[in-house]
Amino acid sequence: MRTLLALLLLAVVASSASAQTPRPGSVEELKQLSIEELVDTDVTSASRRIERLADVAAAITVISAEDLRRSGATTLPQALRLAGHLDVARVSGPQYAVSARGFSISTENKMLVLIDGRTVYSPVFAGVFWETQDVFIQDIERIEVTRGPGGSVWGANAVNGVINVITKKAAATRGTLVDIAAGTSTLGPYGVRHGGRLTNAISYRAYTKVRFEDSHQLVSGADAKDDFDFGQAGFRIESEQAEGSIAFVQGDVYTGTTGMASGTEANLSGGNLLARWSQTYGDHMSTVQAYYDHTYRRVPVQYRGVLNTFDLDAQHQWKAGRQNWVFGAGYRRYDGDDLGDGPGFYFEPRERTSHRLNVFVQNEVHVAGGFFVTAGSKFERNEFTGFEVQPTVRARWSAQRHSVWGAVSRAVRVPTRFDTDLRFRAPGSTTGALLLTGNSEFESENVVAYEAGYRQQLRERISIDLAGYVNNYDDLRTQEFRPGEPVLLANMMNALTRGIESAATAQLADWWQVHVAHAYLWKELTFDPGSRDLTNGRSEANDPRNIFKVRSYVNATNRIEVDAFFRFYGERPSPVVEAYHELDARLGYRLRPGWDLSVIANNLLHERHVEYRAGTAPETYERSVSLRSAWRF
């Protein structure tokens, strides 16, 4: 029935598009960003100010709107696969593990994820519920992925990296877009977005979208019962004045259900509202942002919780001669209620209100010629460990088309309710003894990272990007066995990681562009004297040693695109997941200005494969084909 509905919708769009004239200026031409355009891209995530990608003293990758369009991605995790050095693994249904530089777990807790400056990780466990982080993909301007610590400007949880999703201005999305897709395993997105102008200075857009995913199979061939239905709607209103003042308000609401192995369904809902104002005057720029976020999540017999977040942040940038200052302050409040949905898994206390305060300062100094030095720190106070300091020192030297950089940084992951308040009984038990408990004395996990990198643009057709790092981690989470008592969460593990990351982009011909990336990770775990960790560190990391990705974009004609994405992931050691390689492909055709049709094939090399193992019965992901139509008018 869903497939029939999708095909009917595609037919309606086709017949309507043939009768419509596209809005002038609303249609992007088939194109590829040149190498020059790629290295000149402006980014903001590394230092919270605008700088050229080629001038950033950090390891950073940008996923452009063009990359997203040509990938056929329909969700954020699918889009993040395009970042060459990110480890993106599908855990179950709509749930993913996303990490950089190690420590991949299904509840990944060392990455900071932002959508238009709004933090989306859960303070319950410091990870991201990826199934509820959705955007209208065509509204994304770019995704900036910074690898390595970002705590000096972004604060806690920016331990191994920062993912910053930045959407387009409202003025850039005028007109109407209808996006419809149907495939062998997924229906959707079915989405509509409309934008316009209220006055010469005020623009707006609004959207709605739904998607439906069928359940997958376990390795045994049994039904995983992880089907997923999700709907979301949102808006943005933006004012841009000639005096350098920009202000916008945007918000989203969503609701969805996801199947469980038990045959029941988890219920998900929430919404957010964000407002930002910025003013540029001479060499100064001020920004103030506030947002409210509400989430509700019910997993039958396990968890039923409500979380409300309020965040206020202000920053100021000041360029004075050879110095470029950025400083600011912020406040965040979390109100979390564990409403209870079963006696086996709960938090004690049931309710907790958390307050976090922070200030940061960073200064880049132009020392001489192409040599720049940046130093700064974030100072935060949280309710679990008190005062935390996260400093960084970075240096960069640039000459013509070469750039060399290095950095030393410290970052922390502060405790969560999972670490301090968790109580867990045996499944099915109502009065039995606790099996696992949080620790009120749980400390912050921390890392001291040493990084270096090199970038070069070879003529106009090739660019290369190299980075290396050594990370020292202390006070990592363990599960300590205690005879006659519940297992206790504690900080008795340490780690040393080393890695090399390389990437290259080549314009092999005017009509053919190729991106290649490789990440190598070496990791060693050690334990404090007296530790009796039950998992021997397995519960905190299960990483492949090698990740290799290739993207190819071909403009076969002025209307036809042929794109491919190959990825290789090495073996995950414990629990073991065999190495796998896969290929996705897309054939795009511009039927007429304003109307694009794509055929997308995923996982072409194997009928089914496993990407991650979070339980005793891992899921498999099958070969699939989908048809997608995007119509702009």
Regions found by a protein language model. Give the residues of each.
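Short, acidic, small-residue-rich periplasmic hinge/interaction motif at the N-terminus
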Residues: 20-69
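Extracytoplasmic beta-strand/coil segments of soluble accessory domains associated
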Residues: 44-61, 77-119, 141
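Short acidic/polar hinge/loop motifs at secondary-structure boundaries
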Residues: 119-147
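Periplasmic-side early beta-strands and strand-to-turn transitions of outer-membrane beta-barrels
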Residues: 151-152, 164, 172-173, 181, ...
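Conserved C-terminal beta-signal and adjacent last beta-strands/turns
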Residues: 195-197, 240, 448, 539-633
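Membrane-embedded beta-barrel scaffold of Gram-negative outer-membrane proteins
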Residues: 287-299, 334-337, 398-399, 403-405, ...
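Gram-negative outer-membrane beta-barrel transporters
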Residues: 366-373, 464-465, 469-472, 490-572
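Surface-exposed extracellular loop regions of Gram-negative outer-membrane beta-barrel proteins
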Residues: 383-385, 397-450, 468-490, 529, ...
